[in-house]
């Protein structure tokens, strides 16, 4: 038998809430202006054409269109939104 009662410390028992970061709209998806594309800490993804940056580095679409993930240079990725070109009738 244990001679000490198992006691938790008051220093335990804290855990931060998950922040739900990551890509919210993937390449090839249609988005509307204002849709959030990526939630991130810092600029893991950089803004490309027709993409704005929030104060917390959130990337969002400035126009309706199709999302495209592309290389900015060897290390950096950028996210762009291109308008949908409808065929002439």
From Swiss-Prot:
Claim: Ribonucleoprotein is one of the keywords in the record: yes
Domain of life: Bacteria
Entry's Gene Ontology BP terms: translation
GO cellular component labels: cytosolic large ribosomal subunit
Molecular function in Gene Ontology: structural constituent of ribosome
Pfam families in the record: Ribosomal_L27 (PF01016)
Keywords in alphabetical order: Ribonucleoprotein, Ribosomal protein
PANTHER family per record: LARGE RIBOSOMAL SUBUNIT PROTEIN BL27M, RIBOSOMAL PROTEIN L27
NCBIfam families: L27
Recorded family membership: Belongs to the bacterial ribosomal protein bL27 family.
Protein name: Large ribosomal subunit protein bL27
Species in which this protein is naturally found: Thermodesulfovibrio yellowstonii (strain ATCC 51303 / DSM 11347 / YP87)
Source taxonomy: Bacteria, Pseudomonadati, Nitrospirota, Thermodesulfovibrionia, Thermodesulfovibrionales
């Amino acid at each position: 038998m244990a001679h000490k009662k198992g006691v938790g410390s008051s220093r335990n028992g804290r855990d931060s809430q998950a922040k739900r970061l990551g890509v919210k709209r993937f390449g090839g998806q249609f988005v509307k202006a204002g849709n959030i594309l990526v939630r991130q800490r810092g600029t893991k993804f950089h803004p490309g054409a027709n993409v704005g940056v929030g104060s917390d580095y959130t990337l969002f679409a400035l126009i309706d269109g199709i999302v495209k993930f592309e290389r900015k240079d060897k290390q950096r990725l950028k996210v762009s939104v291109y308008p949908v070109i409808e065929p002439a009738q």
